[in-house]
Regions:
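Beta-strand segments within the central parallel beta-sheet cores of soluble alpha/beta enzyme folds
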Residues: 1, 136-141, 198-203
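Short alpha-helix boundary/capping motifs
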Residues: 14, 154-155, 210-214
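Active-site substrate-recognition segment that forms the wall
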Residues: 4-9, 18-59, 63-160
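C-terminal lid/capping helical subdomain adjacent to the catalytic/cofactor pocket in oxidative enzymes
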Residues: 160-166, 170-225
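Short beta-strand segments that buttress and anchor functional surface loops
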Residues: 13-15, 169
Length: 225
Protein backbone atom coordinates (compact mmCIF):
# COMPACT_ATOMS: atom_id res chain seq x y z
CA UNK A 1 0.00 0.00 0.00
CA UNK A 2 1.37 3.41 -1.00
CA UNK A 3 -0.25 6.83 -0.63
CA UNK A 4 0.95 9.75 -2.77
CA UNK A 5 -0.17 13.35 -2.72
CA UNK A 6 -0.63 14.85 -6.18
CA UNK A 7 -1.50 18.34 -7.35
CA UNK A 8 -4.95 19.89 -6.86
CA UNK A 9 -5.47 18.10 -3.51
CA UNK A 10 -5.63 14.68 -5.16
CA UNK A 11 -4.54 11.64 -3.16
CA UNK A 12 -3.43 8.53 -5.04
CA UNK A 13 -3.65 5.15 -3.31
CA UNK A 14 -1.72 2.34 -4.97
CA UNK A 15 -1.95 -1.38 -4.14
CA UNK A 16 -0.63 -4.47 -5.96
CA UNK A 17 -4.06 -4.80 -7.61
CA UNK A 18 -4.35 -1.25 -8.92
CA UNK A 19 -4.67 2.39 -7.99
CA UNK A 20 -7.37 4.95 -7.26
CA UNK A 21 -7.35 8.75 -7.04
CA UNK A 22 -9.52 10.54 -4.48
CA UNK A 23 -9.84 13.89 -2.79
CA UNK A 24 -10.00 12.32 0.69
CA UNK A 25 -8.76 9.03 2.10
CA UNK A 26 -9.42 7.20 5.35
CA UNK A 27 -6.57 4.82 6.24
CA UNK A 28 -8.08 1.98 8.27
CA UNK A 29 -5.11 -0.38 8.05
CA UNK A 30 -4.32 -0.24 11.79
CA UNK A 31 -1.05 -2.07 12.57
CA UNK A 32 -0.14 -2.44 8.91
CA UNK A 33 0.26 1.33 8.55
CA UNK A 34 2.34 1.65 11.70
CA UNK A 35 5.50 1.28 9.64
CA UNK A 36 4.99 4.84 8.40
CA UNK A 37 7.39 7.02 10.36
CA UNK A 38 4.73 9.64 11.14
CA UNK A 39 2.14 7.14 12.34
CA UNK A 40 4.57 5.05 14.34
CA UNK A 41 5.58 8.01 16.47
CA UNK A 42 2.46 7.24 18.48
CA UNK A 43 1.84 3.57 17.63
CA UNK A 44 3.79 0.40 18.39
CA UNK A 45 3.13 -2.89 16.62
CA UNK A 46 2.88 -5.89 18.94
CA UNK A 47 1.82 -9.46 18.23
CA UNK A 48 -1.20 -11.14 19.72
CA UNK A 49 -1.37 -14.93 19.92
CA UNK A 50 -4.31 -17.31 19.88
CA UNK A 51 -4.87 -21.01 20.54
CA UNK A 52 -8.02 -23.01 19.76
CA UNK A 53 -8.82 -26.34 21.38
CA UNK A 54 -10.28 -29.40 19.78
CA UNK A 55 -14.06 -29.72 20.34
CA UNK A 56 -14.87 -30.29 24.00
CA UNK A 57 -16.97 -33.21 25.11
CA UNK A 58 -20.01 -32.52 27.27
CA UNK A 59 -18.10 -33.97 30.21
CA UNK A 60 -15.08 -31.70 29.65
CA UNK A 61 -17.26 -28.62 29.45
CA UNK A 62 -19.09 -29.65 32.63
CA UNK A 63 -15.74 -29.78 34.47
CA UNK A 64 -15.21 -26.04 34.09
CA UNK A 65 -18.83 -25.00 34.64
CA UNK A 66 -18.94 -22.74 31.56
CA UNK A 67 -22.69 -23.00 31.11
CA UNK A 68 -23.29 -19.99 28.86
CA UNK A 69 -21.46 -18.33 25.94
CA UNK A 70 -20.10 -15.16 27.52
CA UNK A 71 -16.67 -13.92 26.51
CA UNK A 72 -14.17 -13.52 29.37
CA UNK A 73 -10.95 -11.59 29.88
CA UNK A 74 -8.88 -10.62 32.89
CA UNK A 75 -7.84 -7.10 33.87
CA UNK A 76 -4.05 -7.33 33.74
CA UNK A 77 -1.93 -5.32 31.31
CA UNK A 78 -0.76 -8.62 29.83
CA UNK A 79 -4.29 -9.97 29.70
CA UNK A 80 -5.71 -13.28 28.52
CA UNK A 81 -9.10 -13.56 26.88
CA UNK A 82 -11.29 -16.51 25.99
CA UNK A 83 -14.61 -17.47 24.46
CA UNK A 84 -16.49 -20.52 23.28
CA UNK A 85 -16.80 -21.02 19.53
CA UNK A 86 -19.23 -23.51 18.05
CA UNK A 87 -17.77 -26.25 15.89
CA UNK A 88 -19.76 -27.00 12.70
CA UNK A 89 -19.46 -30.73 13.39
CA UNK A 90 -20.89 -30.31 16.88
CA UNK A 91 -19.64 -29.29 20.29
CA UNK A 92 -17.73 -26.20 21.35
CA UNK A 93 -14.09 -25.22 21.21
CA UNK A 94 -12.32 -22.70 23.44
CA UNK A 95 -10.52 -19.82 21.76
CA UNK A 96 -7.81 -18.59 24.15
CA UNK A 97 -5.66 -15.55 23.38
CA UNK A 98 -3.01 -13.36 24.94
CA UNK A 99 0.74 -13.33 25.66
CA UNK A 100 1.56 -10.26 23.59
CA UNK A 101 5.07 -10.00 22.17
CA UNK A 102 7.03 -7.20 20.52
CA UNK A 103 9.18 -7.59 17.42
CA UNK A 104 12.08 -5.18 17.04
CA UNK A 105 11.28 -2.43 14.56
CA UNK A 106 7.50 -2.90 14.72
CA UNK A 107 7.60 -6.00 12.53
CA UNK A 108 4.20 -6.94 11.06
CA UNK A 109 5.45 -10.40 10.06
CA UNK A 110 7.63 -12.51 12.33
CA UNK A 111 9.12 -16.00 11.73
CA UNK A 112 8.44 -17.09 15.36
CA UNK A 113 4.71 -16.99 14.54
CA UNK A 114 5.21 -20.33 12.78
CA UNK A 115 7.20 -22.03 15.54
CA UNK A 116 5.63 -24.35 18.11
CA UNK A 117 7.65 -22.91 21.01
CA UNK A 118 6.08 -19.49 20.44
CA UNK A 119 2.76 -20.77 21.81
CA UNK A 120 4.03 -22.83 24.73
CA UNK A 121 3.72 -19.99 27.25
CA UNK A 122 0.15 -19.31 26.06
CA UNK A 123 -0.66 -23.00 26.45
CA UNK A 124 0.71 -22.78 29.99
CA UNK A 125 -1.58 -19.83 30.72
CA UNK A 126 -4.52 -21.86 29.38
CA UNK A 127 -3.73 -24.76 31.73
CA UNK A 128 -3.37 -22.42 34.70
CA UNK A 129 -6.80 -21.03 33.86
CA UNK A 130 -8.39 -24.42 33.18
CA UNK A 131 -6.38 -27.06 35.10
CA UNK A 132 -9.39 -29.37 34.71
CA UNK A 133 -8.68 -29.53 30.95
CA UNK A 134 -5.17 -30.97 31.04
CA UNK A 135 -6.33 -33.69 28.63
CA UNK A 136 -7.54 -31.23 25.98
CA UNK A 137 -5.46 -30.77 22.83
CA UNK A 138 -5.05 -27.68 20.65
CA UNK A 139 -5.95 -27.87 16.98
CA UNK A 140 -5.12 -24.34 15.78
CA UNK A 141 -2.64 -21.59 16.64
CA UNK A 142 -1.91 -18.25 15.02
CA UNK A 143 -0.53 -14.80 15.68
CA UNK A 144 -0.93 -11.37 14.15
CA UNK A 145 -0.04 -7.71 14.65
CA UNK A 146 -2.11 -5.21 16.61
CA UNK A 147 -1.54 -1.47 16.95
CA UNK A 148 -0.78 -0.47 20.55
CA UNK A 149 -0.85 3.08 21.90
CA UNK A 150 -0.34 4.69 25.29
CA UNK A 151 -4.07 5.41 25.38
CA UNK A 152 -5.11 1.83 24.53
CA UNK A 153 -7.91 3.11 22.29
CA UNK A 154 -8.55 4.34 18.78
CA UNK A 155 -7.33 7.77 17.72
CA UNK A 156 -7.23 9.76 14.49
CA UNK A 157 -4.11 11.18 12.87
CA UNK A 158 -4.70 13.90 10.28
CA UNK A 159 -2.46 14.66 7.30
CA UNK A 160 -2.54 17.06 4.36
CA UNK A 161 -4.93 19.45 6.03
CA UNK A 162 -7.25 16.63 7.09
CA UNK A 163 -7.69 15.19 3.58
CA UNK A 164 -6.03 11.98 4.80
CA UNK A 165 -7.00 10.48 8.17
CA UNK A 166 -5.50 7.38 9.77
CA UNK A 167 -7.87 5.66 12.22
CA UNK A 168 -6.33 2.99 14.41
CA UNK A 169 -4.52 2.05 17.58
CA UNK A 170 -7.26 -0.18 19.00
CA UNK A 171 -4.67 -1.97 21.15
CA UNK A 172 -6.30 -5.38 20.83
CA UNK A 173 -9.91 -4.25 21.26
CA UNK A 174 -10.68 -3.57 17.61
CA UNK A 175 -13.00 -6.44 16.69
CA UNK A 176 -16.03 -4.53 17.92
CA UNK A 177 -14.53 -1.05 18.36
CA UNK A 178 -13.37 -0.79 14.74
CA UNK A 179 -16.97 -0.29 13.58
CA UNK A 180 -17.23 2.71 15.88
CA UNK A 181 -13.76 3.90 14.89
CA UNK A 182 -14.61 3.73 11.19
CA UNK A 183 -17.82 5.70 11.69
CA UNK A 184 -16.08 8.43 13.68
CA UNK A 185 -13.09 8.37 11.32
CA UNK A 186 -15.34 9.10 8.35
CA UNK A 187 -16.94 11.94 10.29
CA UNK A 188 -13.48 13.36 11.06
CA UNK A 189 -12.53 13.03 7.39
CA UNK A 190 -15.73 14.82 6.30
CA UNK A 191 -15.19 17.46 9.00
CA UNK A 192 -18.62 16.79 10.48
CA UNK A 193 -19.60 18.49 13.72
CA UNK A 194 -21.01 15.61 15.74
CA UNK A 195 -21.01 14.77 19.46
CA UNK A 196 -18.35 12.10 18.88
CA UNK A 197 -15.99 14.37 16.94
CA UNK A 198 -16.08 16.92 19.77
CA UNK A 199 -14.78 14.41 22.31
CA UNK A 200 -11.13 14.47 23.34
CA UNK A 201 -10.35 11.05 21.87
CA UNK A 202 -11.32 12.35 18.42
CA UNK A 203 -9.41 15.63 18.74
CA UNK A 204 -6.27 14.74 20.69
CA UNK A 205 -3.43 12.31 20.05
CA UNK A 206 -1.91 9.78 22.45
CA UNK A 207 1.57 10.36 23.80
CA UNK A 208 4.56 9.71 21.57
CA UNK A 209 6.45 6.43 21.80
CA UNK A 210 10.26 6.74 21.62
CA UNK A 211 12.22 5.18 18.73
CA UNK A 212 14.35 2.04 18.94
CA UNK A 213 16.06 0.78 21.01
CA UNK A 214 14.05 2.53 23.73
CA UNK A 215 10.78 1.45 22.07
CA UNK A 216 11.63 -2.22 22.42
CA UNK A 217 12.81 -1.76 26.00
CA UNK A 218 9.62 0.09 26.91
CA UNK A 219 7.49 -2.60 25.29
CA UNK A 220 9.29 -5.30 27.27
CA UNK A 221 8.82 -3.45 30.55
CA UNK A 222 5.13 -2.86 29.81
CA UNK A 223 4.26 -6.33 28.55
CA UNK A 224 6.17 -8.29 31.18
CA UNK A 225 5.72 -6.07 34.23
Amino acid sequence: LAVTWLAMRIVRVRTPEGRIDATRVLLATNAFAAGDRRIRRRVATVRDRILVTEPLTAEQRARIGWAHRQGVYDTRTQLNYMRLIRDPAGGDRILFGGKLAYGFGDATSAPPDFERRTYESLAGAFLRTFPQLADVRFSHAWSGPIALTTRMAVHFQRYRGGDVVWAGGYSGFGVSASRFGARVGLAVLDREDRPETRLRFARELPSRIPPEPFRGLGAALTLYA
